[in-house]
């Protein structure tokens, strides 16, 4: 196995490689004088970027110092010779890898291909040149400095060396007059050359000016090449017009999309409503078919209890057809039993079909009012009074209304006051018992009862207090003897409301039973 390169050879090689203009800046960030190198890619890096490469791992980038490390191998040196910042930049740019992030850049397909290429070129150069320090394109680099004898000061500054002209002139053309002129100047005497003191040093001056002029573009390219794209760009009026037009087009497109979405939502809603209407119509036809299949008595019972959909009365409507008002005529007997305040009640509450959970059962008692209007049910004589005609002008506020009891009491008190005036007109003093007639009547009745029972051997409480009807049991008890007329009216109203509530509850129970067990 061949021995590794010596420290002097390593320093000489890197001194030459770092003298190349493209290798004088960091490959990643462009910092000046990089002193670290990535052997995997053959590029030169600054100390900060070398730390980033170390964090990527040795499988992606292997880092060494060009000044501190002395254990370089010949394969590593060949990789640095065949690589370089210029070659790496051209390869990455050619394969479209322009990312600045190190993790993205060196994990890309272009980085993988360049790693393989550098490894192959380094192995080929090592196999061809062995342990030679320079390869073909660098053989003449260290041999350009022969021993200098006594050189003339003017000759050094008027004639450029061959490697400078080759490096600065890319076309490789040289002026042929310079060698002949230099040889003719060196032949007469070895003393100092005084040709520059003459009147025509035009050729040499033109050469010097051309050399200086050719170095300026290279220097400008190195320092400012990466900052040309950061300048400001002038915006014309035409660009503003184009931007405004694009914004208007985008706004119109957005409005059209919103309108289309709204239209689609409406169409879907209409379709769902139509489907619901069709389902309702199918359910109604099924109920009608079930009702038609029932026999006579069962069908009558179902219609009477409100179980069928066909026998609905009063005001109703269907969602499957147009709105139609179906009014029911109220019987005369029901009209006569309503009071003045019944004008504000809802008509036909029980006739609108089966009750719902949201219905109020406390406002549904007036439907059965016609059942309690007969006189035989109460065992009393009904005083029929002609109800006055109710008009808008006759309706009074609640605060101004007087109940029937107050009106009766006011009439009775008026009669009693007139009779009392006539009876006690000449009396000087009267008592409350005398005014109301309690004292005389009670004493007379007590005396008469005692006289009647004076000869009997046993008496009962009914005989003592005169309860003849209770003792014989032949009479009938009526509410007229217990309650006044106004209280009877209120009592009847309460019974009507209770009966209505019971009817609503019974109807709801029957409907729930039909819904639960009707399909079996």
UniProtKB/Swiss-Prot annotation:
Concerning CDD domains, the annotation shows: ArfGap_ArfGap2
Keywords, ordered alphabetically: Acetylation, Coiled coil, Cytoplasm, ER-Golgi transport, Golgi apparatus, GTPase activation, Membrane, Metal-binding, Phosphoprotein, Protein transport, Transport, Zinc, Zinc-finger
User: How the protein sits in the membrane?
Assistant: Peripheral membrane protein
Q: Where are the zinc fingers (C4-type)?
A: 26-49
Q: Which residues carry this modification: N-acetylalanine?
A: 2
Q: Where is the Arf-GAP domain?
A: 11-127
GO CC annotations on file: Golgi membrane
Q: Extract the ranges annotated as region (Required for interaction with coatomer).
A: 97-520
Task: State how it assembles.
Answer: Interacts with the coatomer complex. Interacts with the C-terminal appendage domain of COPG1.
Q: What does this protein do?
A: GTPase-activating protein (GAP) for ADP ribosylation factor 1 (ARF1). May regulate coatomer-mediated protein transport from the Golgi complex to the endoplasmic reticulum. Hydrolysis of ARF1-bound GTP may lead to dissociation of coatomer from Golgi-derived membranes to allow fusion with target membranes.
Q: What is this protein called?
A: ADP-ribosylation factor GTPase-activating protein 2
